[in-house]
């Protein structure tokens, strides 16, 4: 007999959704099913339950109102790229940079065979199953899309209220027959009757699996952020990139900012950098140059479609920031610090003795005593970080003091420039303008950076990260590069965004960062805007157009002339070596690499002589 646990009254007449919820309930066998309505009362109830369970600890209500601290299991602290699968019908559609598994084989691992076996069978026993309807993007926007996540984690249900538009309004928008992405999540820790729970349930077996043709996500064994908040990377990038390929738009790992000069109209800029290259810092920039202001649209993901006027329009599909805490402080990102005043959840940071949070880089002075993320006493002599390097904050975007008024405009904002960049100590100048769209795609295809703590791997290795999408592209990366070429083919080239490559991380022979970065990066944005308006000079080099020394505003900047020359130099010898690395990279994708990128490579070699 099927357990019709989601029987009426349910808050929707969407029969496909109701029967799917029943099907998952029958498979996972939860003790109860709760349809989330997204209300403030529900959020408070979930947080209260998490406090009772020991998952959450309420922070000092004066210092950090309505905010909580959570510590994960020490084995469940980051995205697990080696357990992340793209289960496309054909292996070549996943491509060489994704892990592929046959979809039928993967489904058998999850649901077993003929009603027996499978990781999800009975995985929610002893737990509550939450049905979490959510919208990526402003409700009602033609650029937005809907999803429903089924999860046995109250931490996930609560976090989804911050990170997405969630609850009853989404079910209302969905109607009786609307399309939604199906997302199933279990921490994989069923409870037997009388068995005590742990504060952070998870399983040593982990799968984060995507079924692109079915627009489905199944995640097992992890309660951590990107593995469990399935609206984020799983939907907004991996599944959405496939939707975008099929429908002629772009789903990208990009911040979006609004830049307003002292006179003239604002410009909207999108930028793609790999993890830990300063996306959030740039999205919330406080320019040091007088009269220029930056406002935030989004800090991590952009969905972009061409409008009827031929311009590319972007929305931020998220409603919150899920940021890396360490390194975020008054000096590096004052606006992020102001955003975190309250209504936030902090995971794997350190706790102060007076009931607040702390992490490396938050303050100039390190506290004399803390409780570290593993719950141990900590002092500056401990010799280990107090916060995990990938510790996170989850906070509402609406609290950002410089959130742009149009951040939720259903039409999106028109993008004038797209920036790519990585963390490169060598070769790559401060800023390079592409010659045209396809050359810009070539620059994006060659993004490279050092590995960071946001994924499990060694720190400091150089890794190619095309478009900063390597861990997030839901299909063959060669086809993805081809899609970037294709979307612009029939467009008015004069209306396409200009593409730039930036590098804040150039080092001299002594290992010193030559460019001061942070707020000074506004000077580079100023040059870009003036280029867009035809008011700034540039010099053609073999790799693209660079600022002349005079056209980059360095007034009031303590930067030696030799350093400026170094930042704006192209060493042909070094660049011949750099160019020699490109064929191996493009060959990775075989005949999926678009011919246009090989044309760009050959043109680069010719220009380098």
UniProtKB/Swiss-Prot annotation:
GO terms for molecular function: GTP binding; manganese ion binding; phosphoenolpyruvate carboxykinase (GTP) activity. It catalyses: oxaloacetate + GTP = phosphoenolpyruvate + GDP + CO2. InterPro entries: PEP_carboxykin_GTP_CS, PEP_carboxykinase_C, PEP_carboxykinase_GTP, PEP_carboxykinase_GTP_C, PEP_carboxykinase_GTP_N, PEP_carboxykinase_N. It holds the Pfam family PEPCK_N. Mn(2+) binds at residues 233, 253, 300. Binds 1 Mn(2+) ion per subunit. The active site is at 277. Its cofactor is Mn(2+). It is found in: Cytoplasm. Its main location: cytoplasm. Keywords: Cytoplasm, Decarboxylase, Gluconeogenesis, GTP-binding, Lyase, Manganese, Metal-binding, Nucleotide-binding. GTP binds at residues 276-281, 392, 423, 518-521. Pathway: Carbohydrate biosynthesis; gluconeogenesis. Substrate binds at residues 79, 224-226, 275, 390-392. It comes from the Bacteria. One of its GO terms (biological process) is cellular response to glucose stimulus. Its EC number is 4.1.1.32. One of its GO terms (cellular component) is cytosol. Catalyzes the conversion of oxaloacetate (OAA) to phosphoenolpyruvate (PEP), the rate-limiting step in the metabolic pathway that produces glucose from lactate and other precursors derived from the citric acid cycle. Belongs to the phosphoenolpyruvate carboxykinase [GTP] family. HAMAP family: PEPCK_GTP (MF_00452). Monomer. This is Phosphoenolpyruvate carboxykinase [GTP]. It comes from Streptomyces coelicolor (strain ATCC BAA-471 / A3(2) / M145). The gene is pckG.
């Amino acid at each position: 007999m099927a357990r019709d646990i989601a029987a009426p009254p349910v808050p929707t007449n969407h029969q496909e959704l109701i029967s799917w919820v029943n099907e998952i309930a029958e498979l996972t066998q939860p003790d109860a099913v709760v349809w989330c309505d997204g209300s403030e009362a529900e959020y408070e109830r979930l947080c209260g339950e998490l406090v009772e369970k020991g998952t959450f600890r309420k922070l000092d209500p004066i210092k950090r109102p309505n905010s909580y601290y959570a510590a994960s299991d020490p084995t469940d602290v980051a995205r697990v790229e080696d357990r992340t699968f793209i289960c496309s019908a054909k292996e070549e559609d996943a491509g060489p940079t994704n892990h592929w598994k046959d979809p039928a084989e993967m489904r058998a691992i999850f649901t077993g065979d003929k009603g027996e076996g499978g990781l999800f069978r009975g995985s929610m026993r002893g737990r509550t199953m939450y049905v979490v309807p959510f919208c990526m993007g402003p409700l009602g926007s033609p650029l937005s899309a809907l999803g429903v996540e089924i999860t046995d984690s109250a931490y996930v249900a609560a976090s989804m209220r911050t990170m997405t538009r969630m609850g009853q309004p989404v079910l209302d928008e969905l109607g009786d027959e609307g399309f939604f992405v199906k997302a199933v999540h279990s921490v994989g820790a069923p409870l037997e009757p009388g068995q005590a729970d742990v504060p952070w349930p998870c399983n040593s077996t982990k799968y984060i699996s995507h079924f692109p043709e079915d627009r489905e996500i199944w995640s097992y064994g992890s309660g951590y952020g990107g593995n469990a908040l399935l609206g984020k990377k799983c939907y907004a990038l991996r599944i959405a990139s496939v939707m975008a390929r099929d429908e002629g738009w772009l789903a990208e790992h990009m911040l979006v900012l609004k830049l307003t000069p002292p006179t003239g109209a604002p410009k909207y800029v999108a930028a793609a950098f790999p993890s830990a290259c300063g996306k959030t810092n740039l999205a919330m920039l406080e320019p040091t140059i007088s009269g220029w202001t930056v406002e935030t649209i989004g800090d991590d993901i952009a969905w972009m479609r061409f409008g009827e006027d031929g311009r590319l329009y972007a929305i931020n599909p998220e409603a919150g920031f899920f940021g890396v805490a360490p390194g975020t402080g008054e000096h590096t990102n004052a606006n992020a610090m102001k955003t975190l005043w309250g209504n936030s959840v902090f995971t794997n940071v350190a706790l102060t003795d007076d009931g607040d949070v702390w992490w490396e880089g938050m303050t100039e002075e390190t506290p004399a005593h803390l409780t570290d993320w593993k719950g141990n006493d900590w002092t500056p002599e401990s010799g280990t970080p107090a916060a995990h390097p990938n510790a996170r904050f989850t906070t509402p975007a609406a609290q950002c003091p410089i959130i742009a008024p149009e951040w939720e405009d259903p039409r999106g904002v028109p993008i004038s420039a797209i920036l790519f960049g990585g963390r490169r100590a060598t070769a790559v100048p401060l800023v390079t303008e592409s010659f045209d769209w396809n050359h810009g795609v070539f620059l994006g295809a060659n993004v490279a950076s050092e590995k960071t703590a946001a994924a499990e791997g060694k720190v400091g290795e150089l890794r190619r990260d095309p478009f900063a999408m390597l861990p997030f592209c839901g299909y063959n990366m060669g086809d993805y590069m081809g899609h970037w070429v294709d979307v612009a083919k029939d467009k008015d080239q004069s209306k396409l965004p200009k593409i730039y490559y930036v590098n804040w991380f150039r080092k001299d022979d002594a290992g010193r960062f030559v460019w001061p970065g942070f707020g000074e990066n506004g000077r580079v944005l100023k040059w870009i805007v003036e280029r867009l308006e035809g008011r700034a000079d540039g010099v053609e080099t073999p790799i693209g157009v660079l600022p002349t020394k005079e056209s980059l505003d360095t007034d009031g900047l303590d930067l030696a002339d030799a350093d400026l020359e170094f930042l704006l130099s192209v060493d042909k010898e070094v660049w011949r070596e750099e160019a020699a690395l490109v064929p191996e990279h493009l060959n990775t994708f075989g005949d999926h690499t678009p011919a246009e990128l090989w044309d760009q490579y050959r043109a680069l070699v010719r220009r380098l002589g």
